[in-house]
Amino acid sequence: TVRADEVPLATVPGMPPVADPANLYRETGANQFSPAVAHALERVYVPNRAANTVSVIDPATLKVVDTFKVGVNPQHVVPSWDLRTLWVANNAEGRSDGSLTPIDPVTGKPGKTIAVEDPYNMYWSPDGRYAIVVAEAYKRLDFRDVNTMELKFSIQTPACAGINHADFSIDGRFALFTCEFNGAITKVDLVNRVVLGTIKLSPYFNRPDALALIATPGKKPRMIPDPGQPGNEICTTPGMPQDVRASPDGKTFFVADMMV
């Protein structure tokens, strides 16, 4: 008899196999580093958005050992799919000179910056074929060559204002992206390259009459009468999701919402 947790999980072509369908994080424990990072320096890379720099910290001494210039408004430092490069996402907020700066983790030094439109954040397709650049200002996901960052195709996400952070389904077929500025989550089909839907993070997600009364971000929330349920009130606080993570078995996603 074969136990359910011993049956291989069907994933998208090219994606590494899931070692344990009951715990997708099983291979991320202590002393389970990939051979690809064997020669990488043990460092912490911190983007300094206002200074347009990255500071490098030695965790053994807790001292800054280097600081170097990158592009305008660095937001995140993201390891590549093969773990051999770190990419700094410089989105140049409100400008047109966004870029990506590679860092060699073996030397801790930056390489040549590549011009890329509005890279607020970065992910990778589960098969490692594409870099997924989160173009927040344009409500768009740009799929690019993992080395040259040449644009290959885009997926528009018009209902996802402030698209930023994401996590993937355990089989690699879809991803959920948070929509920070309109309190929502967007589901993207990575196989067919389409948006499957967007849902508001609100107790009133299935009530358009109530959602229409929710305050826009930046507005002071208040309690107002519920138009659909006399005697009840609605808090107009909008959601502001920051991140999303899958449960170990991949059956549930947890959203970190700083407002609701």
Language-model segment annotations:
Residues 1-260:
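Predominantly soluble domains enriched in secretory-pathway, periplasmic, or organellar proteins
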